[in-house]
Structure formats: structure tokens, C-alpha cells
């Protein structure tokens, strides 16, 4: 019985570590196609456009992370689209990821993976020198216009197209888990970190 409990706790720790590594890998592989939202936190899910996990010519992926009650317990979940090669496919997958986080059907659930037990979670963006709520307009100012650009092209990207400098993940893990309490994980955009996250 004791060995069984130790094995179960060890599995929980390894699964959480793998989930956190995948979270970091998803953010490290973040790409922003022109005029396309590549990162979005809506208070329920974090959606990311990222490079494919295989060869670079295999298109892009949309991944999403959320917390949902599964069998009466909070669960941290990850969803991933199939490889996408057209803008239309990307838009459909982006919308599907939002739908999955809110009210998934069987088709969406087939593409999800349960990561870890989770009581609650929060996401913050690092912008203009401070951690802010992504749903707040604080710190979400668009970049300054490019000098010499035509008026139409000089229009700055809206806040939803401006990537933050960092993403903070705050997980509240259940008291009965192998690891419990609050866990905070910060990620810094590779272009700012000199190649390290």
C-alpha cells in the first residue's frame, strides 16, 4: 500500500513536470503570422499559435490550456490542433480552441490531454516593466508607429496583436496532491532573454 502511494505521488510529480515543460515549449515555439493574433488569455484559456512539433515545413499548431472540472475535480488540460497550413485553417483552429475551453464537444475532447489536478490558475503578462492582468488595458499599449510608413501602414497593431515580454503562470495545486499550494512559473520571450527562457 505504501509503495503504491509513493508510486502515485511520483507519477503526479513527473506528470506536472512534463506539463510545465510542455507549457514552456509551447511558449518558446510561439510564432506570430502577419496580422494574426498569436497569444490570447480570455480568463478561461490561454491560446497560442506555435511552430509544429515536427519539421518546420509542417505548418503551425494552435494549442490551448485551460482548467475544467472533470469527474468533480479541477483538472489542468491542454488541447492541440492538427498541423495547419492555411490562414483559414488557422482561424478555424483558433476558434475551435476557444470553443474547447468553454464547452467542448466529443471531437474537441479527443484532442485534449489531462495534465494535472488543479484548483485554480491565473495568467499575467509582463508589459512595460510590470506584470499585468492580460484582460486589463493597463500596459497593453500598442507599439509606437514606424517612422516613414504610409498612414494606413502606420496604424499600430491593436493590443491583441502585441506580444507581451513575458507570461506568468500561477497554479494553485490541490492540498491532497504530491505537490500542493501555489506554484509560479515565469516565461520570458526568447528574443528578450538572449535565447534562454
Task: Name every feature range the model reports, one short phrase each.
Residues 116-197:
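Short linear sequence signals and composition-biased patches located at protein termini or domain-edge surfaces
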Residues 1-24, 28:
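Aliphatic-rich helix starts adjacent to a transmembrane/signal segment
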Residues 37, 54, 107, 158-160:
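Residues embedded in well-ordered secondary-structure elements
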Residues 27-50:
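Short, glycine/small-hydrophobic-rich surface segments
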